[in-house]
Swiss-Prot record:
Belongs to the UvrB family. Keywords: ATP-binding, Cytoplasm, DNA damage, DNA excision, DNA repair, Excision nuclease, Helicase, Hydrolase, Nucleotide-binding, SOS response. This is UvrABC system protein B. Residues 25-182 form the Helicase ATP-binding domain. One of its GO terms (cellular component) is cytoplasm. It comes from Anaplasma phagocytophilum (strain HZ). A motif (Beta-hairpin) lies at residues 91-114. It comes from the Bacteria.
Length: 653
């Protein structure tokens, strides 16, 4: 059995050794939930990796979006090159959920483009979990969404080994039952037979196939072949073919499921007709009958997940199977950026239910489709294994779950300390922001200003522009591609000041920023809560000269808590640097060079009209914007962005 072994040129430093020790000892004592409070740049990922290495248990790391998950995945792969590090996120390149808008009588069919590589990685993840112990899965919150039964997925595998006797026709039938397609084209999830040679392209491989050579009904040899070069890369003693779908179902079980679907359909049609909903009755009858016929013929259909209650043998309202059900009971779970991820997990169920209820009411789906859903928060809580919440600003939920006990990691390898916080009167704040900005710009640095309203951001931007400051603003009305272009301009110095409303959601990581100005810091609310203030203050922590000015006529409870926490961290960091002779250095980070092949994008009031590159990251940002509209039931806006994605995908760099 393989063991976790970190490969790194660096050893644990600063607070890392103590954090690793405390977390590991807590797990050993049976502590179910712990908090790692780690400031940005302190090496939280290395700490997580070290705990996994110490405990030698399978691990799941949950991030709040695909981009962050991808970063963590790459880091973990570097730390564990000889172990199974897997990536499990939604496999849609874009996704417009099925929806119905009653007021305009518009039905929007589910429209999705499945990313084949991500689908392959999902299969690789579930296969690794079921076959080995040295596995780390980095996932987005999609890991709490419904997935096929792990028991069926595991039971329906086809083990093949040298010397094994198996009828060729029987093997082909089994592969078809696992949703593999027969054909001459060699692509993932297919197989072909030429004479006594069966070539299988496994669901979890990107470019390797298995070549099974038979002598009569006996397997003579098994080779792993590079599909691009046609060269054998390994001779294998045995392989296990996993299903090409997580919703694969044995034929007898499938027929039982179809019978139950038929029963529900008849009840549904009778109910619609009884309530004089003739159109809805005909609609559900036609759509469901078509799906039933497809499943009878091929074992699957479009939207098969909506019948998961029956396919997985679940009772009405019973929690769906998810990735969590595939994991061993002794697995470790890390919730990264828990102050964002936990609220996201909490909100998933309700948004999904509202959308599906609309479809059911108007005859587009059977009521059982409600069971194709994410876990409720309570269900997720009941499935938690040994868990570590990771954040620079843990939320109330996390600290309550651990009775206020946290493991701190405050020291950065670069020696950078948290910025100095200054409180100034709110009266006259505009004039002072201008003066402070000009002074900071003259030293070659950038400025971030956070305002409370879009109008204030626009007015301040206009005022600064009139006096010759290169400025732009960001808020929710600024489109994704424009937003990315503005941030790039700030990094390169085309813009010196960036004004925003909620700069937290921009994910700004700007080493050139030496000043953050928080206007109306004493106006209590989400944007001026303790967590938001600490996160905003952290925007200046990438620069050794970082300062934060909070404009307020009174010091609120949130302000005091945020400033006290920042000062506490700074004192710890300065003391450590002094004791170890460390001189802080600003982070050096290259500006992305992906703005070369350009297409025209409409400019904003905050910047001149110019062009912006369309990269993979651009498309991902738009997809997130589209999903946000869909979650808010703004399906027409989501549809508009989906169309924009389709156009821009043709211009990706």
């Amino acid at each position: 059995m393989r063991h976790f072994k970190i490969t790194s040129e660096f050893d644990a430093a600063g607070d890392q050794p103590e954090a690793i020790r405390k977390l590991s000892e807590g797990i050993e004592r049976g502590v179910r939930e712990q908090v790692l409070l780690g400031v940005t740049g302190s090496g939280k990922t290395f700490t997580m990796a070290s705990v996994i290495e110490k405990r030698q248990c399978p691990a799941l790391i949950v991030a709040h979006n695909k981009t962050l998950a991808a970063q963590l995945y790459e880091e973990m792969r570097m730390f564990f090159p000889n172990n199974a590090v897997e990536y499990f996120v939604s496999y849609y390149d874009y996704y417009q959920p099925e929806a119905y808008i009653p007021h305009s009588d518009v039905y929007i069919e589910k429209d999705a483009l499945i990313n084949e590589k991500i689908d392959m990685l999902r299969h690789s993840a579930t296969r690794s979990i079921l076959e080995r112990r040295d596995v780390i899965v980095v996932a987005s919150v999609s890991c709490i969404y419904g997935l096929g039964s792990p028991e069926l997925y595991s039971e329906m595998t086809i083990p093949l080994s040298i010397g094994m006797q198996i009828d060729l026709c029987q093997l082909k039938e089994k592969l078809v039952e696992l949703q593999y397609k027969s054909g001459s084209q060699c692509e993932r999830g297919t197989f072909s037979v030429k004479g006594d040679i069966v070539t299988i392209f496994p669901s979890h491989h990107e470019d390797h196939v298995w070549r099974i050579s038979m002598f009569g009904d006996v397997i003579e040899s098994i080779q792993e072949v590079d599909n691009n070069l046609g060269i054998a890369v390994a001779n294998l003693e045995k392989v296990k073919v996993f299903p090409n779908s997580h919703y694969v179902t044995p034929r007898p079980t499938l027929m039982q499921a179809l019978s139950r679907i038929e029963e529900e359909l008849q009840e549904c049609v009778i109910n619609y007709r009884k309530n004089n909903k003739i159109i809805e009755a005909e609609r559900i009858l036609e759509r469901t009958k078509f799906d039933i016929e497809m499943m009878k013929e091929t074992g699957t259909c479009k939207g098969i997940e909506n019948y998961s209650r029956y396919l997985c043998g679940k009772a009405a309202g019973e929690p769906p199977n998810t990735l969590l059900d595939y994991l061993p009971v002794d697995s470790l779970m890390f919730i990264d950026e828990s102050h964002i991820t936990i609220p996201q997990i909490r909100s998933m169920y309700n948004g999904d239910r509202v959308r599906k209820a609309n479809l059911i009411t108007h005859g587009f789906r059977l009521p059982s489709a409600l069971d194709n859903r994410p876990l409720t928060f309570e269900e997720w809580e009941s499935r938690k294994t040994t868990l570590v919440y990771v954040s620079a600003t843990p939320g109330k939920y996390e600290t309550e779950r651990t009775s206020g006990v946290v493991v701190e990691q405050l020291i950065r390898p670069t020696g950078l300390v948290d910025p100095i916080c200054i409180v100034k009167k709110a009266s006259g704040q505009i004039a002072d922001v201008v003066n402070e900005s000009q002074a900071t710009i003259s030293e070659g640095y950038r400025v971030l200003v956070t305002a409370l309203t879009k109008k204030m951001a626009e007015n301040l931007s206009e005022h600064m522009r009139e006096i010759g400051i290169k400025v732009a603003y960001l808020h929710s009305d600024v489109k994704t591609l424009e937003r990315m272009d503005i941030i790039a301009q700030l990094r390169t110095g085309e813009i010196d000041v960036l004004i925003g409303v909620n700069l937290l959601r921009e994910g700004l990581d700007i080493p050139e920023c030496a000043l953050v100005c928080i206007l109306d810091a004493d106006k209590e609310g989400f944007l001026r809560s303790e967590t938001s203030l600490v996160q905003t203050i952290g925007r200046a922590a990438r620069n050794m000269n970082g300062r934060v000015i909070l404009y307020a006529d009174r010091v609120t409870k949130s302000m005091k808590a945020a400033i006290d926490e920042t000062n506490r961290r700074r004192a710890v960091q300065e003391s450590y640097n002094k004791a170890h002779g460390i001189t802080p250095k600003s982070i050096s980070k290259s500006v992305a060079t992906s703005l070369k092949d350009r297409i025209t994008v409409k400019g904003t009031k905050g910047s001149k009209s110019k062009s912006a590159a369309v990269t993979e990251e651009d498309i991902i940002k738009l997809q997130k914007e589209m999903l946000l509209h869909a979650e808010n039931l703004e399906f027409e806006k989501a549809l508009e962005i989906r169309n924009q994605i389709n156009k821009l995908s043709q211009h990706k760099t």
